[in-house]
Amino acid sequence: MIQMQSTLDAADNSGARKVMCIKVLGGSHRRYAHIGDIIKVTVKEAIPRGKVKKGDVLKAVVVRTRKGVRRPDGSIIRFDRNACVLLNDTTEQPVGTRIFGPVTRELRNAKFMKIVSLAPEVL
C-alpha cells in the first residue's frame, strides 16, 4: 500500500535512486496504490548524469510493495522494499531501458508489457 509521502526505490536505470509519492492517481479521494497502479512521484535522490535529476516530478508504476498482492489461489507475493518504475508523463512508457529486480504477473494485466519484457524475473 503506497500513499502520499511514501518513499520508494526506483527499479530502473533512469538515474533516480529514491522517489517519494506525492499523489495516487485514479480518483479524487483515492488513498492507496497497489502493484500496477500509477502514482505521481518526485525524485529525492539521483545519481550524477542520469536521465532524471533531483526535484523532477513524473509518473511511476508501482512494481513491488511490502504489502504484497493476493493471488486467486490464496497465495500472497510480498517483497522486502517498495519499488516503482518511472514513466514518461505523456506516453506512459518507461524512462529507463533496464529493470532491476523481479516484477509480478499483475503488471501484464495492467498493460505494462514493456516493463514485463524488460524485467529479469516475473513472479
Swiss-Prot record:
The keyword Ribosomal protein applies. InterPro entries: Ribosomal_uL14 (IPR000218), Ribosomal_uL14_bac-type (IPR005745), Ribosomal_uL14_CS (IPR019972), Ribosomal_uL14_sf (IPR036853). SUPFAM superfamilies: Ribosomal protein L14 (SSF50193). SMART domains: Ribosomal_L14. One of its GO terms (cellular component) is cytosolic large ribosomal subunit. GO terms for biological process: translation. Keywords: Ribonucleoprotein, Ribosomal protein, RNA-binding, rRNA-binding. GO terms for molecular function: large ribosomal subunit rRNA binding; structural constituent of ribosome. Belongs to the universal ribosomal protein uL14 family. Binds to 23S rRNA. Forms part of two intersubunit bridges in the 70S ribosome. Part of the 50S ribosomal subunit. Forms a cluster with proteins L3 and L19. In the 70S ribosome, L14 and L19 interact and together make contacts with the 16S rRNA in bridges B5 and B8. This is Large ribosomal subunit protein uL14. It comes from Aliivibrio fischeri (strain ATCC 700601 / ES114) (Vibrio fischeri). The gene is rplN.
